[in-house]
Amino acid sequence: MKYQAKYIRMSPTKVRRVVRLLDGMTYEKASQVVRFLPYRAATCVAKLLKSVNAQATQRVHFYVDQAPTLKRIRARAQSRAYPIKKRCCHITLEI
């Protein structure tokens, strides 16, 4: 079974930092560990785990993919503009 959280406004690399710690754990262990992680991405992963709890009896496996990037512009000196990429990600949970 696959569960997804899509278009999360966080960089995929920052979310992968949390997901690597939890990959392969049982549901109970992963939900306990994610509560005490000091990263902002842990809240998104915890929400995804919470929505799956009825079906989760085995090990959980996570995947993080890049979603479409929001492109913004930062105004700079002398009428120049620098691009800013606000990255998003999709988190997939497999049981």
Curated annotation (Swiss-Prot):
Pfam families: Ribosomal_L22. Its main location: plastid. SUPFAM superfamilies: Ribosomal protein L22 (SSF54843). It is found in: Plastid, Chloroplast. Gene3D superfamilies: Ribosomal protein L22/L17 (3.90.470.10). Part of the 50S ribosomal subunit. This protein binds specifically to 23S rRNA. The keyword Plastid applies. One of its GO terms (cellular component) is chloroplast. GO terms for biological process: translation. The keyword Ribonucleoprotein applies. One of its GO terms (molecular function) is rRNA binding. Belongs to the universal ribosomal protein uL22 family. The gene is rpl22. Keywords: Chloroplast, Plastid, Ribonucleoprotein, Ribosomal protein, RNA-binding, rRNA-binding. This is Large ribosomal subunit protein uL22c. It comes from Cyanidioschyzon merolae (strain NIES-3377 / 10D) (Unicellular red alga).
